[in-house]
């Protein structure tokens, strides 16, 4: 609503406030001071004095202030503003959605919301009855109710949306064909309609049906001065297309007698051209085909041209057609013979009967007056049947597509009419309004008081006028009423309308005994509830017969237009002796059916009032409105409402609706009350805290006095489900937090171990390559053995690695494998002898590097580079030795024969790089090619006298027995059980484990609801134990590690050292509360926490809107978050340190710089995560990110059939997982060091590299570190 401006006050436009200006809260606060103040009372039951004058004064105050709606309890009073107040926008509509009438100002949307809510909540049909004078705003109210229901009824299905569109499209279509301008209303409904919208059990519209009542067809052929015909005629004549004008000979509205006789062609605020476009669009939405639309317009053109047929009187006094060209065009439109049209309009066929047998047939000429009546009768019949056809077509389109459960009906019917000349049409209209008033009285006054007496409710009777006596005066048969007298007059003098009218006058004289009827010769007076109306008898019996003469029906029967013939499906049977139903019969039958429908639904009332007869937005006619207040019975309605009860229902339905509100009648959503429905209903009302004077218990029903009480019950019921939903959501969120915490733990473990999995996959691939054909060394099968590849750390840029990389000129080429090895070297005149080397494997080649001494410095040089594409096969023996040969093609240098501790890993990486394109042979002997293509062979012999490794001498390798050939890696060693932190973040468990279930209150047995035959099946109570319940356990003693897995001790002294006791577990911490301290003073309002500076509060819940739920002294309330600062949690006491463990003494001798042979202890036993470097310092476990897999550029020949495809061994670099802010991590691992590893000890890089023997000094340092690690594991075990 726009802010009101005071006179003479300058209003400065406000500047935009950036993004904050878009906030809904800020916008509402800005408007708070500009809201229009309420004038008068919104509910007239609150008036201090109850009189017609006080009601009128309250309505006038509100209407003058632009507030046209006022309540009397649940009845809405609407005063037509005759202007657009902007109160039907989408924004206003949304404010009424889901609100009861006490939460928002009075509005027609509130009535629509109440009807829709009650239908869904109570599963009862609803109807909205709109009554009032013509021009009071009934049609507009019905349109807004339909608009609201279409907006809130949901349903995204295309079929449901189509139903909504078609329901809304009926408004412009029926307004065009059924509304006209009258002296009192520019858009007066000249018919009545009852729209029934069908809904499924989800509250979605699935169909609709329209019932039409009493179209004022007489308006087609005549209107009084300054009124108009139906809108469609002016729309059609003004906005028809050129094709239509050509086909139908169409001209402007001034060219036709039916549209120009009242001298009113245009109406202010009505655009006929624009409305015609809306009519065409509505026809398309409803589903009328272009052919059907064309036939409709042809019928309209036929009616217009029929009105232009004029009659002259000849010498004999008979009628003749003035212009036969008009009748010729009418015959063209009706597709009949022109002569037949002329004859049907100017003559009448009369048939005589004699003794019940057919006699002679005569053509009786008609005088001009009779011919004009026949012409008008034909026009009225065509238009009336056309309107009925359109309504039937709409109902076919709106037919339900699926099953429906409930209905909302909207009654928009003609208002009470009092004119200077009142005839049969006004009698029927006022009769229907009398019936509606009777329904209002029956349901709101008479029936209600009778129910109070029947239910023995304390009640003060209210006197009121019951208009049933007026309804009986019009519709009763015995004694005969007005309609019965009309029918008798038509039956006795059916041939002569004048004689029939005189007969009716005589018969109606007998009705004078009724105090509400008065006969005055050719007129009679009826005292309606809305006032006294004088009716003229002339022509009333003819209108009551409402039938075409046989000649005109025969004319239509000869038409070649099938559409025209379909408009008249029922032809009277000339041989039938049964009297055809009259217009009064049909209107009485329709009104009775309407009353039956309305009585089967729960009604909502809208009483419309017309403020003046000039359609002025500023004129308030106090006298006219006071008259409407009186005949609408608003004063009696207020008295009954104040003395009565707003809501009543049977005990069974009350219990079924509200049993959830009492803990004695419900448990976990089940009905548990064992008493009768009445006692259960009384228990519910007591437990909800409702005052005793607000409700009474009757014989079969419970009565609630004020609607506020009912709304409170509904709010509590809605909150019950909301609270239950919140509990379920809270439990689900706890479950999700628990689940996410478990997932995070798994993810952390995975991030810390996923690289190890990659290395283990490569190791398993190595097992597949060997395929149980070669004996294994025990240390090759350790569970912690990983195929890490680059043992010389060439990719890591260590000092040794840089030297080797420069010697090989690797550049950016990634290194897949590097280690120390021995190469079998042949010397002139001497037997071959192993010599230390370094071997490097890249995706392109194998590099063999030799170290020589020059001037006391180590010099690295590339001895040989072997391209991978030149390697044909690899050979190994079946024993546990370390020898293998790379068989190449014809070369001068021959095949290299190498001995390497990591031979299996080298072969595995080589097979991966070549996609298993190399033959891999394992046999008791290996063959290789020496220089100049000389063949040689090495034999392998088992020799148990060899203490360890193997010994080469004269092409024979002596090797001890190893592990069986089918051996695989040992399973991972069991870690020592420590104190596991329980997963309690989701609050599913208390710290320390789950609590025992509370069995203090047994689960009640479910009972059947009142009206049910079988009790509801009780859901078994299932107590589920979360998976986190078992995570807190006492530390178990470490299981002994098998000898095959545990590394041997190095010295006896180390074995004698007892293992240290495990550290004590940390004290079990109580659940940590998140505490905050107030930074400033804060004065809270209702629902807010008042704070004093330095107050300490416990945080319960955070909300995104800036308010936090806190707890202080056992009270929970909301506080602004920026007034609080967190109190740092107290650090948990550290556990006592474990006793110091004596450091084992290593007996591994440090290799001298001049050593040239490998020491036996230099053999690597395993590769462990976090193993020491050559100098005993820490070494990162993961490989460098520079190491990647690649494939040789050239393709290789096919390999042997026994090849195993390598697994994908990608090595992603794990991201560093940072701890969550604000969450302490006691005992967490420190971050990995980011600096480079220190250089090996022993007197500098050169000194460390000049070591000889076996695997080289670098390998010796590595072996020493491994030995220390093995000793440490042995000590721990």
UniProtKB/Swiss-Prot annotation:
Record domain Myosin motor: where: 39-718
Binding site for ATP: 132-139
Note on domains (UniProt): The myosin motor domain displays actin-stimulated ATPase activity and generates a mechanochemical force. The tail domain participates in molecular interactions that specify the role of the motor domain. It is composed of several tail homology (TH) domains, namely a putative phospholipid-binding myosin tail domain (also named TH1), an Ala- and Pro-rich domain (TH2), followed by an SH3 domain and a C-terminal acidic domain (TH3).
Chain residue ranges for the region called Disordered: 1-27, 567-587, 952-1072, 1129-1259
Protein's organism: Coprinopsis cinerea (strain Okayama-7 / 130 / ATCC MYA-4618 / FGSC 9003)
Protein name stated in the entry: Myosin-1
Entry's family note: Belongs to the TRAFAC class myosin-kinesin ATPase superfamily. Myosin family.
IQ domain sequence ranges: 722-742, 743-768
Residue ranges occupied by any SH3 domain in the UniProt entry: 1071-1129
Main localization, broad class: cytoplasm
Keywords: Actin-binding, ATP-binding, Cytoplasm, Cytoskeleton, Hydrolase, Motor protein, Myosin, Nucleotide-binding, Phosphoprotein, Repeat, SH3 domain
Domain TH1: 776-965
Main function: Type-I myosin implicated in the organization of the actin cytoskeleton. Required for proper actin cytoskeleton polarization. At the cell cortex, assembles in patch-like structures together with proteins from the actin-polymerizing machinery and promotes actin assembly. Functions as actin nucleation-promoting factor (NPF) for the Arp2/3 complex.
GO (cellular component) term, any one: myosin complex
Domain of life of the organism encoding this protein: Eukaryota
Stretch list, region Actin-binding: 407-489
Subcellular location: Cytoplasm, Cytoskeleton, Actin patch
Positions with biased composition (Polar residues): 1145-1159, 1185-1197
SMART domains documented for this protein: MYSc, SH3
Gene Ontology terms, MF aspect: actin filament binding; ATP binding; hydrolase activity; microfilament motor activity
Biological processes, Gene Ontology terms: actin cortical patch localization; actin filament organization; endocytosis
Comp. bias intervals (Pro residues): 1057-1068, 1132-1142, 1204-1224
Compositional bias of kind Gly residues: 1241-1258
Post-translational modification: Phosphorylation of the TEDS site (Ser-360) is required for the polarization of the actin cytoskeleton. Phosphorylation probably activates the myosin-I ATPase activity.
């Amino acid at each position: 609503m726009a802010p009101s401006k005071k006179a003479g006050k300058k209003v400065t436009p406000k500047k935009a406030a950036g993004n904050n200006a878009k906030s809904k809260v800020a916008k509402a606060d800005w408007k708070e001071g500009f809201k229009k103040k309420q004038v008068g009372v919104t509910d007239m039951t609150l008036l201090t004095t109850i009189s017609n004058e006080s009601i009128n004064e309250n309505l006038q105050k509100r209407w003058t202030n632009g507030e046209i709606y006022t309540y009397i309890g649940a009845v809405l009073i609407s005063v037509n503003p005759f202007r657009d107040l902007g109160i039907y926008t989408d924004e206003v509509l949304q404010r009424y959605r889901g609100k009861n009438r006490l939460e928002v100002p009075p509005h027609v949307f509130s009535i629509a919301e109440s009807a829709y809510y009650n239908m869904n909540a109570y599963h009862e049909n609803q109807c909205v009855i709109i009554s009032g004078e013509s021009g009071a705003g009934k049609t507009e109210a019905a349109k807004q109710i339909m608009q609201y229901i279409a907006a809130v009824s949901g349903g995204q299905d295309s079929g449901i949306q189509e139903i909504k569109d078609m329901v809304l499209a009926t408004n412009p279509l029926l307004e065009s064909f059924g509304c006209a301008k009258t002296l009192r209303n520019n858009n007066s409904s000249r018919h009545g309609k009852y729209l029934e919208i069908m809904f499924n059990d989800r509250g979605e519209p699935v169909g609709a049906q329209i019932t039409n009542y009493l179209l004022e067809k007489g308006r087609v052929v005549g209107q009084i001065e300054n009124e108009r015909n139906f809108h469609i005629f002016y729309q059609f004549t003004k906005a028809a297309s050129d094709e239509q004008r050509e086909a139908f000979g169409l001209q402007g509205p001034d060219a036709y007698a039916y549209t120009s006789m009242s001298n009113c062609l245009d109406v202010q605020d009505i655009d006929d051209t624009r409305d015609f476009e809306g009519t065409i669009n509505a026809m398309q939405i409803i589903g009328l085909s272009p052919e059907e639309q064309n036939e409709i317009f042809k019928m309209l053109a036929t009616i217009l041209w029929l009105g232009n047929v004029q009659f002259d009187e000849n010498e004999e006094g008979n009628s003749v057609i003035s212009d036969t060209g008009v009748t010729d065009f009418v015959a063209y439109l009706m597709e009949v013979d022109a002569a037949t049209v002329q004859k049907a309009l100017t003559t009448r066929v009369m048939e005589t009967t004699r003794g019940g047998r057919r006699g002679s047939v005569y053509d009786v000429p008609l005088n001009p007056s009779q011919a004009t009546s026949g012409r008008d009768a034909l026009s009225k019949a065509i238009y009336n049947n056309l309107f009925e056809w359109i309504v039937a077509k709409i109902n076919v389109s709106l037919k339900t597509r699926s099953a429906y459960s409930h209905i909302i009906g909207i009654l928009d019917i003609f208002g009470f009419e009092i004119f200077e000349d009142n005839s049969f049409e006004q009698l029927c209209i006022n009769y229907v309004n009398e019936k509606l008033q009777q329904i209002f009285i029956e349901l709101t006054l008479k029936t209600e008081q009778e129910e109070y007496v029947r239910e023995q409710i304390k009640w003060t009777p209210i006197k009121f006028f019951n208009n049933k006596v007026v309804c009986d005066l019009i519709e009763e048969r015995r004694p005969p009423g007005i309609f019965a007298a009309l029918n008798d007059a038509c039956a006795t003098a059916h041939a002569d309308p004048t004689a029939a009218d005189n007969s009716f006058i005589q018969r109606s004289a007998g009705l004078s005994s009724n105090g509400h009827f008065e006969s005055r010769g050719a007129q009679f007076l009826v005292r309606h509830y809305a006032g006294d109306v004088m009716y003229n008898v002339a022509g009333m019996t003819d209108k009551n017969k409402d039938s075409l003469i046989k000649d005109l029906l025969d004319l239509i029967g000869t038409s070649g237009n099938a559409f025209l013939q379909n408009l008249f499906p029922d032809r009277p049977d000339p041989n039938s002796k049964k009297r055809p139903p009259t217009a009064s019969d049909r209107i009485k039958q329709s009104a009775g059916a309407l009353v039956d429908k309305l009585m089967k639904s729960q009604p909502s009332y809208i009483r419309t009032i017309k403020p003046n007869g000039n359609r002025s937005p500023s004129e308030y006619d106090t006298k006219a409105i006071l008259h409407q207040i009186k005949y609408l019975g608003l004063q009696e309605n207020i008295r009954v409402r104040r003395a009565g009860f707003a809501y009543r229902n049977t005990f069974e339905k009350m219990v079924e609706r509200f049993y959830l509100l009492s803990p004695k009648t419900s448990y976990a959503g089940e009905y548990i009350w064992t008493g009768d429905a009445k006692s259960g209903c009384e228990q519910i009302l007591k437990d909800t805290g409702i005052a005793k004077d607000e409700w009474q218990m009757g014989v079969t029903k419970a009565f609630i006095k004020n609607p506020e009480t009912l709304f409170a019950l509904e709010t509590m019921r809605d909150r019950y489900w909301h609270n239950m939903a919140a509990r379920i959501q809270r439990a689900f969120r706890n479950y999700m937090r628990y689940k996410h915490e478990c997932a995070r733990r798994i993810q952390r473990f995975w991030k810390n171990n996923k690289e190890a999995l990659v290395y283990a996959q490569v190791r398993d691939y190595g097992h597949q390559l060997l395929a149980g054909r070669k004996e294994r060394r025990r240390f090759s099968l350790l569970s912690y053995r990983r195929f890490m590849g680059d043992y010389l750390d060439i990719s890591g840029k260590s000092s040794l690695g840089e030297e080797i990389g420069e010697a090989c000129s690797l550049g950016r080429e990634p290194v897949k494998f590097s280690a120390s090895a021995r190469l079998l070297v042949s010397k002139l005149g001497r037997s071959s002898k192993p010599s230390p080397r370094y071997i490097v494997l890249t995706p392109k080649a194998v590099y063999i590097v030799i170290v020589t001494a020059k001037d006391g410095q180590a010099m690295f040089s590339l001895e040989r580079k072997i391209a991978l594409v030149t390697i044909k096969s690899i050979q190994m023996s079946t024993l546990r030795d370390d020898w293998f040969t790379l068989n190449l093609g014809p070369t001068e240098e021959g095949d290299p024969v190498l001995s390497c501790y990591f031979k299996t890993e080298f072969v595995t990486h080589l097979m991966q790089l070549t996609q298993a394109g190399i033959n891999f042979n394992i046999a008791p002997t290996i063959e290789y090619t020496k220089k100049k293509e000389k063949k040689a062979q090495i034999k392998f012999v088992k020799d148990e006298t060899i203490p360890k490794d193997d010994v080469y001498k004269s092409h024979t390798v002596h090797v001890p027995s190893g592990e069986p050939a089918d051996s695989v890696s040992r399973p991972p060693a069991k870690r020592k059980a420590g104190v596991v932190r329980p997963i309690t973040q989701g609050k599913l468990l208390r710290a320390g484990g789950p609590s025992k279930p509370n069995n203090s209150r047994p689960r009640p047995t479910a009972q059947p609801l009142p009206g049910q035959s079988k009790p509801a099946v009780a859901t078994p109570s299932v107590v589920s134990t979360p998976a986190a319940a078992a995570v807190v356990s006492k530390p178990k003693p470490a299981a002994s590690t098998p000898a095959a897995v545990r590394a041997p001790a190095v010295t006896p002294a180390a074995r004698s050292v007892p293992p240290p006791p495990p550290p004590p577990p940390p004290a079990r911490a109580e659940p940590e509360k998140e505490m905050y301290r107030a930074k400033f003073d804060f004065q809270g309002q209702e629902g807010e926490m008042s704070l004093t500076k330095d107050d300490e509060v416990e945080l319960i819940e955070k909300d995104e809107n800036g308010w936090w739920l806190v707890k202080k002294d056992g009270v929970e309330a909301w506080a602004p978050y920026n007034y609080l600062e967190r109190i740092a949690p107290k650090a948990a006491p550290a556990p006592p340190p474990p006793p110091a463990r004596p450091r084992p003494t290593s007996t591994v001798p440090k290799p001298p710089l001049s050593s040239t042979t490998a020491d036996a202890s230099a053999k690597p036993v395993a590769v462990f995560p976090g193993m020491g470097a050559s100098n005993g310092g820490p070494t990162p476990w993961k490989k460098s990110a520079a190491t990647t897999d690649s494939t040789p550029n050239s393709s290789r020949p096919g390999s042997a059939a026994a090849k195993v495809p390598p697994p994908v061994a990608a090595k992603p670099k794990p991201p560093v997982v940072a701890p969550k802010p604000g969450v302490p991590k006691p005992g967490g691992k420190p971050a990995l060091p980011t600096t480079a590893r220190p250089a090996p000890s022993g007197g500098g890089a050169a000194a460390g590299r000049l070591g000889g023997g076996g695997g080289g000094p670098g390998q010796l340092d590595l072996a020493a570190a491994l030995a220390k690690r093995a000793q440490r594991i042995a000590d721990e075990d």
